[in-house]
A protein has these predicted regions:
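Short, hydrophobic beta-strand segments
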Residues: 56-61, 145-165
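Conserved structural position at the C-terminal beta-strand
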Residues: 70, 107, 171-173
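Short beta-strand elements
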Residues: 79-85, 177-185
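Short, conserved beta-strand segments of beta-strand-rich sandwich/propeller modules, principally
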Residues: 63-67, 102, 166-170
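Short acidic/proline- and small/hydrophobic-mixed sequence motifs that coincide with surface turns
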Residues: 114-117
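Substrate-binding clefts and catalytic carboxylate motifs of secreted carbohydrate-active enzymes
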Residues: 1-98, 110-111
Length: 185
């Protein structure tokens, strides 16, 4: 079913551009009459979004908070926020509800925020009754899915496992605190 409730979504992240660009194109998709974009609390203007198209701004990059607010008539009805994150310091494993054990491995900064542009090479291993079936990072990676190591893409790697008894899933990368997830069967 198509959703109709108001929604706004900032495409991408708000970390420094890898290419050093000073001006960053920001796209915002919205189900609202108009969208207003704010950088560190200062308005960058509004765009009409009633035609269902995205709104776009050319924003001078500055670290901090990028906030998009969607309006119906003149009332704010939805918002989306991106924050500049710090450097990755540790890995984190998150279980995803699924028919089979599925995990997302992410990088976190010192404040515990997901670093969306992190790209470390991550090695996975399992202990006990846990077996790694596949890994994937959603890019055009030529490494076969069954290989338990790969480079993170857009700050995430998916890990599929089989669990026959209690055990653990471990993620490790050079220079980062490893992650360990205990699984009880």
């Amino acid at each position: 079913l198509l959703r109709t409730e108001p929604r706004v979504h900032i495409l991408g992240h708000w970390n420094a551009p890898a290419d050093g660009a000073k001006i960053v194109p920001v796209w915002v998709y919205a189900r609202a009459d108009r969208v207003e974009l704010f950088l560190n609390g200062a308005s960058l203007g509004t765009r009409d979004t009633r035609d269902g198209r995205h709104a776009e701004w050319q924003v001078p990059y500055a670290p901090g908070e990028l906030r998009a607010v969607g309006y119906k008539e003149d009332a704010p009805v939805c918002e989306d926020v991106r924050h500049t994150t710090g450097k990755p310091v540790k890995l984190h494993l998150i279980p995803v509800e699924s028919d089979m054990p599925l995990f997302t491995c992410e990088c976190l900064d010192e404040a515990g925020r997901t670093v969306p542009d992190a790209a470390p090479y991550v090695r996975f291993r399992a202990e006990g009754g846990v077996r790694i079936l596949a890994t994937g990072s959603d890019n055009a990676d030529p490494i076969p899915p069954a290989v338990p190591e790969r480079q993170m893409y857009m700050g995430q790697i998916a890990v599929y496992a089989r669990v026959s008894a209690s055990g653990a899933l471990i993620a490790e990368a050079d220079g980062l605190v490893p992650a360990r997830y205990e699984i009880r069967a």
